[in-house]
């Protein structure tokens, strides 16, 4: 990045932000700056931050809808909705310790990265709760889902496209989200000493049972021994949430169904919440210097990642999300994951964060990029060729 890019531009209105983008300078787009290390922005001339767009526009708890500017801090939103007995359903991770950053993640940043926590397997991904958006395209045009139609982007689902685009298609300035009532009670069942394959089968069985498991994770022995878990053997965890009587009945049903797995312990609500924060934030891997990979795979084959690639792993989403610490060659990591039908993103390390897209997907991405940002001014190079 050039010396000029050291200046961080913090517009206070969407119109001012659009004016900056319309100038055509190449921009590194950030919210709280906590994920700047994921992907490498090449040739940016300035840094554009949404941190000054930090107001809650409207919150109607009775309608389960919240509208806020993109620069609102995620932690502040969580406090706001919790005071009304509600929650962000997709349980967004902060990842500041894992990524070794000092900033505060923002609502826009979490949605731009489409980051979801353990509850994704029950409630859906971040993009599934993204009801509306206002954004500025690379042309400097202000667009809204369900609002003004701009001919160059007509026909696109704005929310679905911007979620996971890492700021390469448009700069989110305002979003509307669905919120849900927070669970009245929760508990977590713990099983010990299972292999990765056994845990994968157990999590699949639990998720297919009529008990509404809201989170399922497996921490192998080598990972469980790390702080903060410090467990002597592998831990497989299954969370249940809801009304107290329902949670208790479902826990009894699930424990009976998994009786063959051996000793089962229960974490009460407080300890359960602490445990899932550790899983959500991948705290066991925060201090290890090795390259870190975030791998999405079909849950039924997730355990094969740890079996095939040397390193330490942690499984979330019933095996569908695998965090991997490994010095293995990036080509090996991506090759194994590709054969499993998944995708690997390098969150820490020297490898490119995002793998190049193949054939028709690359062509489609190029067409979408051309529609939203034809001159490539937004986060150039962050997602590779996109």
Regions found by a protein language model. Give the residues of each.
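Glycine-rich beta-strand-to-loop/alpha-helix junction loops that act as flexible
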Residues: 29-35
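A generic structural signal for well-ordered alpha-helical segments
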Residues: 24-27, 81, 258, 337, ...
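Short, conserved charged micro-motifs
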Residues: 16-17, 76-77, 196-201, 245-252, ...
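N-terminal glycine-rich flavin-associated loop
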Residues: 2-29, 50-103, 111, 115-148, ...
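C-terminal substrate-binding/cap subdomain adjacent to the FAD-binding core in PCMH-type
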Residues: 112, 131-289
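Conserved glycine-rich FAD pyrophosphate-binding loop
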Residues: 41-44, 51, 261-386
């Amino acid at each position: 990045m050039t010396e000029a890019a050291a200046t961080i531009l913090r517009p206070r209105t969407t119109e001012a932000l659009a004016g900056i983008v319309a100038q055509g300078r190449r921009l590194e787009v950030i919210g709280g700056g906590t994920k700047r290390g994921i992907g490498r922005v090449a040739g940016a001339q300035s840094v554009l931050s949404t941190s000054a767009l930090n107001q809650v526009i409207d919150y109607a708890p009775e309608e389960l809808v919240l509208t806020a500017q993109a620069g609102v801090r995620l932690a502040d939103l969580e406090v706001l909705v919790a005071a009304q007995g509600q929650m962000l359903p997709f349980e967004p991770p902060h990842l500041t310790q894992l990524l070794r950053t000092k900033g505060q993640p923002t609502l826009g940043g979490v949605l731009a990265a489409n980051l979801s926590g353990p509850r994704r397997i029950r409630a859906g991904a971040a993009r599934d709760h993204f009801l509306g958006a206002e954004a500025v395209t690379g042309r400097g045009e202000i667009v809204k889902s369900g609002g003004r139609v701009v001919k160059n982007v007509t026909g696109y689902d704005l929310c679905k496209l911007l979620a996971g685009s890492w700021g390469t298609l448009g700069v989110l300035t305002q979003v509307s989200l669905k919120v849900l009532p927070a669970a009245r009670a929760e508990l977590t069942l713990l099983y010990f000493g299972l292999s990765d394959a056994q845990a994968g089968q157990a999590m699949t069985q639990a998720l297919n049972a009529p008990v509404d498991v809201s989170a399922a994770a497996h921490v192998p022995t080598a990972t469980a021994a790390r702080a903060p878990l410090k467990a002597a053997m592998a831990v497989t965890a299954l969370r249940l949430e809801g009304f107290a009587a329902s949670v208790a009945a479902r826990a009894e049903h699930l424990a009976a169904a998994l009786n063959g797995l051996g000793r089962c312990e229960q974490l009460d609500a407080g300890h359960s919440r602490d445990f899932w924060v550790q899983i959500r934030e991948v705290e066991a891997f925060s201090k290890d210097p090795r390259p870190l990979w975030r791998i999405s795979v079909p849950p039924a084959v997730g355990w094969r990642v740890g079996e095939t690639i040397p390193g330490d792993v942690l499984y979330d989403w019933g095996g569908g999300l695998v965090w991997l610490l490994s010095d293995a060659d990036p080509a090996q990591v991506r090759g194994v994951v590709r054969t499993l039908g998944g995708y690997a993103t390098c969150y820490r390390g020297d490898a490119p964060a995002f793998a190049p897209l193949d054939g028709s997907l690359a062509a489609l991405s190029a067409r979408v990029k051309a529609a939203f940002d034809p001159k490539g001014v937004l986060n150039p190079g962050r997602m590779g060729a996109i």
